[in-house]
Structures are given as structure tokens and as C-alpha cells.
């Protein structure tokens, strides 16, 4: 990715929080799967009226994660450092956030209420994106939004799993998919 593309890729707020039906709603409860350095969580907390936000990220290497990330130089030390940066970045919102340091599939019992939104930016392999959508869609409140990052079709092969999983879910359930790169979302 060239420098200009990388800068555009990291611009906040992202389309998800700018264009979905979340703007103007009060006391939102949501979740972000795949927090990384906390940049997007910070943008969500700054942009939207969020009462509570579950931040879900294991910050640990696991077999399927390693397959996709080792070529980026990601190792356990990098993940631990990223977690420290995320926690520092989000300190001002500590009364609004609940950290869940687990895989998203293991985090489900920790969520005790309906969610107004779920933002998925975890493992980009098709099976994991499918699992996240299937697991978290039923937790959405009426009018809730599920969406995520990296909906790139064709020109970034490492994100093909996102496109396949999202498209399959939308077609299978007769839903309307909204896309503004790099984000996608579906309103319940």
C-alpha cells in the first residue's frame, strides 16, 4: 500500500459511524471485534453517543491468526505492545468501555444486553468473519447495525474472506448491504 492510500485508509471517522443510522441516537451500546491499537474505538467513542462499548480482542497469537499475519511481522510482543497503546489511547473513556480479552466467539457470554452496533475488524478469514456475523447478528437491537472494515473486492487478496462472508450473509438473509470503502454495514 502506498503512503497516500495508507493515510486515506486510516482517516477517522470512518464511513460506518458517519453514514449508518447510528448518528443522532443516544446512549448506544455496542461492540468492536478486533480493537488493535484502539484508533477506531476512539473514533466511535468520540463521534457517537455511546453509553457502553465492549472491546473484544484476545491480543494473543493463535494458529489461524498466525497464518494471516506473520508476513506483516506481527508477533506476541507486537500484539502486547498494541494492547498497551490501545488502553492508553482509550483511558479517557474508561467508564464507558468493557475490555474483553478473548476471541470473539468466547466473548459472547460476557455480553449481557442487546447491542445497537457491532463493528467487525478481527480475523479477516472467511470462516471467522462468518462466525462473527452469525454470532453477533442475533444480539442486535431492533434498528441495530452490524458492519466492519476492509470490504475490498478483488484488489486486496487478504480481505477476500471479508467480502465472501458478508456477501453470503446478505444474500442468504435477503438483506441490504451498504458499502463505502473501506467499510460495510447492514441495518437490522
Language-model-detected regions and their locations in the chain:
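S-adenosylmethionine/decaboxylated-SAM
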Residues: 2, 17-188
Amino acid at each position: 500500500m502506498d503512503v497516500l492510500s495508507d493515510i486515506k485508509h486510516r482517516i477517522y471517522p470512518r464511513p460506518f459511524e458517519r453514514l449508518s443510522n447510528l448518528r443522532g441516537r443516544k446512549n448506544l451500546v455496542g461492540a468492536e471485534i478486533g480493537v488493535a491499537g484502539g484508533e477506531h474505538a476512539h473514533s466511535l467513542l468520540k463521534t457517537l453517543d455511546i453509553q457502553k462499548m465492549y472491546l473484544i480482542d484476545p491480543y494473543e497469537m493463535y494458529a489461524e491468526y498466525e497464518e494471516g499475519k506473520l508476513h506483516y511481522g506481527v508477533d506476541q510482543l507486537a500484539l502486547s505492545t498494541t494492547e498497551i497503546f490501545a488502553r492508553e489511547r482509550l483511558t479517557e473513556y474508561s467508564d464507558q468501555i468493557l475490555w474483553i480479552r478473548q476471541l470473539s466467539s468466547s466473548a459472547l457470554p460476557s455480553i449481557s444486553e442487546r447491542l445497537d452496533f457491532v463493528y467487525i475488524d478481527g480475523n479477516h478469514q472467511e470462516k471467522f468473519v462468518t462466525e462473527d456475523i452469525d454470532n453477533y447478528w442475533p444480539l442486535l437491537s431492533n434498528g441495530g447495525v452490524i458492519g466492519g472494515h476492509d470490504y475490498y473486492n478483488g484488489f486486496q487478496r487478504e480481505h477476500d474472506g471479508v467480502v465472501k462472508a458478508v456477501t453470503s450473509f446478505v444474500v442468504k438473509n435477503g438483506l441490504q448491504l451498504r458499502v463505502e470503502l473501506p467499510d460495510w454495514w447492514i441495518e437490522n
